[in-house]
Amino acid sequence: MTQITNTRLQGRTWQRIALTAAAGVLGIFGAVFTVTNRASGDHLTTSDNPGKLPSALYASAIAETYDFKFGPNPFAPSNATSVTGTFIPAEMFLSSARCGACHTDAHAQWRQSAHGNAFREPFYQKNVKDLQNQKGIEFTRHCESCHNPAALFSGALTKGSKVKRPFDDDGVSCIACHSIQSATGRGIGGYVMGEPALLVKEDGTHLLAGITDQQILDDIPSHRRAMMRPLLKTADFCAACHKSQVPKELNDYKFIRAFAVGDEYQMSSFSKESPHPYYVRDKETCNTCHMKREPAPLFDVSAKLGKLASHRWPAANTAIPVFYKWPEQLDAVNKFLETDALGIDIFALRRKSPGTGPEEFIAPLNRSSFSIKPADRITAEVVITNKNIGHSFPPELRDFYEAFVEFTVTDEQGQTLYQSGFIKPNGYLDETAHNYKTYLVKLDGSYNDKHHIWRTRGIAQNNQIQSGRSDVARYQFRVPQEVAGPLHIKARVQYRRFTRVFSDYALGKSVEVLGTAWDRIH
């Protein structure tokens, strides 16, 4: 008889190999930025009054030495822009630690999140430094629009820049995210950055410099106007960065779509914005899935009934919390992965005995009794379903993430008779694995396995499962003559961040962190 277990996706740490690399670039706090007004010879400094330097003067001073390599748009080749179309003083991007004085829980969660480490974490640092070294810092504007907005808008991304960068440690900071005014839908920085402020008065006046915590507490409505708007709760807001492309300016070839999680969500059952999905699902958004309310033990001022929207944004990034040794973040990610996200079902067997007619099709297995004999040729059909994810699985950067089906057949003594999709002793994935991956191709036809997207010329394979859809993996083996007793067949989906090639490249040593959804028959 067939026994089908309940399926689930669960994060599981299998092995942690000692790391040999340090974390990326850390910010330098308390630095002074000085701009010279060349007409008068005066020096304007903002070390004592952050944000006080006039924006127009700042923008003019930066423009004098800025490399407008991609035309008059200073933020190209990203799609980001500011409300004025020009630079924003670096000091206006306040440290997130300032917010943490009152928003204690949100700040603590953000600090361990992928957003809070979007620039400094070593995997990104390795990649963006390669781009800078191979093509120039101007090209990193494409990436930094979503990994370090303050660097982009302050004009720091030009050769010989004198802009001090205390914001590097913050990545996607509180003030950067909460200052975005609108989204354009174009991806890779498809947003308009507003003028950062701590208070916005009813008449639209923006206040930042010299504002104290007490002034904020005395005028919560103005603080709310500065920090919150309906846009922040929409999928369009998240899609401003969770949608990407390789523009012609970057690869010297042509526009290539990289990923479009926002578009995938819109086409899913969860958005209620598309007539195409077959399955009916309750309305979900990016926020309701990735920012569920959780307890606020540090008494965050924004907590309601002791809870606030999680600023951990748990998803599938196990690499950052393992690298920085943050068990709380890793636990949040693991719990998120334990939800009923994927389904995997050993749905059918095809049996062909020697000397017999056509093969026999047995399905569904949980409703059929059957037996097999030595020398039978068995083909197992495994169905993998993206049940409760509002976008593709795996999403986004499939070229250096790795998801695959692990399939094993064992005898009663536990001896492996057949396997596919396993991690070899050297840490690399079995080449026969049924995997979900994007294979990028360089100009010379070789595989672009280090995420050097600026060298991408084409996509050889892009295997994934869209929301609400299924994939079938087939495995064929022959029952050994000497086998007696039942066989055990097990299938599970494994996921690791990152591929061994990329993690070794970035760190020198790898971190094995795998998540799984599984099914088995006996």
What does each model-identified segment do?
Residues 1-11:
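N-terminal secretory signal peptides that target proteins for export/translocation
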Residues 139-153:
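Long, hydrophobic/aromatic-enriched structural stretches that serve as scaffold segments
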Residues 19-32:
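Hydrophobic membrane-insertion alpha-helices, especially the h-region
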Residues 43-90, 106-139, 155-457, 462-467, ...:
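Primarily the internal scaffold of c-type cytochrome electron-transfer domains
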Residues 9-21:
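N-terminal Sec-pathway targeting helices
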Residues 32-46:
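Signal peptide processing junction and immediate N-terminal pro/mature segment
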